[in-house]
Regions:
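Gly/Ser-rich "nucleophile elbow"/oxyanion-hole loop immediately N-terminal to the catalytic nucleophile
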Residues: 58-62, 115-128, 132-159, 175-179
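Short beta-strand element of the alpha/beta-hydrolase
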Residues: 63-73
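N-terminal cap/lid segment of alpha/beta-hydrolase-fold proteins
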Residues: 20-62
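Cap/lid segment of the alpha/beta-hydrolase catalytic domain
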Residues: 75-84, 103-124, 287-293
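Short amphipathic alpha-helix adjacent to the substrate-entry channel of hydrolases
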Residues: 81-102
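Active-site-adjacent alpha-helix of alpha/beta-hydrolase-fold enzymes
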Residues: 93, 230, 235-282
């Protein structure tokens, strides 16, 4: 395979990525941000569908990548203004991103713990809400572009339950992925509009994302990660049993459906060949992200995420809403010798996509 990549290099034109990026998306280059609250659903008008959009003050750039971030709370608590949400969105907006922290539909603790069917429905509704929020930005782009975004570069992430939502949004590709036994989850989708796009509106626009950020999140079934899927970056403590680092019941409660964390997701991602990276906080439990910037591990997670996302960015190339392609995904970054690498400055990078195309870039710093 490395020989094949090397032969491909002979016919590849070089893209020099001067930063228009220029420290954007890496360092906090803006001093402050503006937060705008919107209702992101065009057919559900309630507090569950409120979203705070963070934009850097004084920024004249347009065509900016987006990160949507979702709060934790075990699917029966939490809001968009929790400390980690505010700190994550503020920090990434100061780096030049447009970021958003969103509410989503919740259950009650009694209903959620009483029935695994309710747990499936609650997660599916939350995924539907997040998909609507993604479509909100693409719809806005097509109708005036209020926020100056690149609709081709949208990342989804969150902490705990928020990470669970992001992972299920990205990696459940088809209704047939969902189990039919012992609970027929495919039939439960009728509760959220009849298909995976859900019932929260903004229809007619893509809900695809270009990467997933998981802070202590997990998947119910890691086999949903396949070779055509989005890049994954995750950060988790190895002693996490709230969302088990390997696999176990959510919140360590036998009444709750199993979740499989970073210890299972990344071997799967490696096996199927999607771009991924993981920061393991050895000996750490679940709560490291909850206090935001006051915990040094949260700062480390922000920097790790920033470094992972940076090579995925188009750095302000022109974009058209009709150019969105959910079929071309970055699967590997290698150097001139064919070795898989992370982002490096002043060094040729070769980005390998799942459609067989290769792009060479040099990030000039």
């Amino acid at each position: 395979m490395k020989k094949l990549y090397f032969l491909l290099f002979l016919s590849i034109s070089i893209t020099f990525v001067f930063a228009q990026c220029n420290d954007r998306y890496e360092a906090e280059i803006f001093n402050s941000v503006t937060v705008t609250e919107v209702n992101y659903s065009d057919n559900l008008q309630d507090s569950y569908h409120k979203m705070d959009i963070y934009t850097p003050d004084g920024d004249t750039e347009i065509n900016r990548p987006i990160i949507l971030y979702m709060h934790g709370g075990s699917f029966y608590g939490g809001t968009k203004v929790m400390t980690d949400c505010v700190d994550f969105c503020t920090s990434m907006a100061k780096r030049g991103y447009v970021t958003a922290s969103l509410n989503y539909r919740l259950s009650t603790v009694w209903d959620f713990l009483a029935s695994q069917e309710e747990q499936y429905v609650t997660v599916l509704k939350a995924v539907a809400d997040a998909k609507s929020a993604i479509r909100y930005f693409r719809k806005d782009f097509a109708n005036g572009d209020t926020y100056g975004v690149d609709p081709n570069t949208i990342f989804i992430g969150g902490y705990s339950a928020g990470g669970v939502i992001a992972l299920h949004l990205a990696y459940i590709d088809n209704l047939s992925d969902l189990p039919t036994s012992p609970i027929n989850v495919q039939n439960l989708v009728s509760n959220i509009g009849g298909d995976l796009e859900g019932d929260a509106g903004n229809y007619g626009y893509s809900s695809e994302v270009q990467g997933v950020i998981s802070f202590a999140g997990g998947l119910n079934d890691v086999s949903w990660i396949d070779a055509n899927d989005e890049p994954l970056v995750s950060i988790q403590g190895s002693n996490d049993i709230t969302v088990n680092y390997y696999c176990g019941p959510g919140t360590n409660n036998p009444l709750v459906l199993d979740l499989c964390g970073s210890g299972e997701m990344h071997p799967r991602a490696d096996n199927v060949g999607i771009l991924n990276d993981h920061l393991n906080f050895s000996g750490t439990d679940h709560a490291w992200a909850a206090s935001g910037n006051s915990n040094s591990k949260f700062i480390d997670a922000l920097e790790f995420t920033t470094d992972f996302l940076y090579p995925l960015l188009p750095c302000n190339n022109t974009t058209d809403i009709n150019d969105i392609s959910s079929n071309k995904k970055l699967i590997k970054i290698i150097d001139i010798l064919g070795r898989e690498i992370k982002k490096q400055n002043n060094t040729p990078l070769f980005c390998i996509y799942d459609d067989g195309s290769v792009e060479q870039k040099i990030i000039i710093k």
